[in-house]
Amino acid sequence: MYPILLGINGISYGSFTECELNVLPRLMNIVDRGVVENKKPQYPDKSWWTILNMEPTNNTPSDPSLAPLVKLTRAALINIPVVNPTYGLYSIKLDQGTSYEEEVNNVIGALIKTAAKAPVIAAITAPDRFLHNNQSIKCNVYSVIDEAIGSLINGGVSAFILFSPYGEPVGPNEGDHEEYGIYIATISRPRHYDTVKLYEIGMLFRDLVESTLGV
C-alpha cells in the first residue's frame, strides 16, 4: 500500500478518552504523535490550501491537482474541502445532506482501494459539518471515525499521517474551533518540543512518500 495523508476536520485529543475510543489511542502509543497548531479563525479551504501548497500563502491554484504537494507526490485526491462540493474521487456537499456514517465509510473505502495504486490525500469533514450545532452526537461521530481508522490499518496501510487541521468546533460559527488538532503518524514531526504547523504537514507527507517509495 502507498502512503496516505488523512485529515479529519475538527477532532481533538481530549475526546479520545471521553468517547472511549479504541484504535486512535492505541495508535498514539505505537507511532509518532504531536499537536497541530492553527490559530482562529480556521476555515477548511484555507487550512487545506496551506497544506497542499506546503507554505503559509494565499496563493490558491484553480485546480487542486496542480498544487505543489499533489504534483510532487502524484497523489490521488479524495474529498478535499478546498471547494464546495469537495474535490476528488469521492465528493460531497459541505452541508448535512450526507450522513457522517456515509461520508466516513465512503472515504475510507475509496482510500483503501486507491492506496493500492498510488499515494492518497483524503479528508473527512463530518465533525466540522455536524458538531458546530450538535455536540450531543460527538461520541457517535468519533466512534464511526475510530472504527474506520481500524479498517484502514487492517487494510494494509503502514505509512500514514493522520491529523486534524484544527480542533473541535467550540461554537456555531464556521471558523470557531479549538486551536490544536491531532498528529498521529509514521513519520516524526520536525521538532518534538514544538507544535506542527499546517504547511509542515504537506512537507512531511512529501518526505514520507519520498522515503517510502525511494524517489
Language model features: what each stretch is:
Residues 20-26, 138-141, 176-179:
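Glycine-rich, phosphate-binding/catalytic loops in enzymes
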Residues 173-212:
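Substrate-binding rim/cap in mid-to-C-terminal beta-strand-loop elements of soluble/periplasmic
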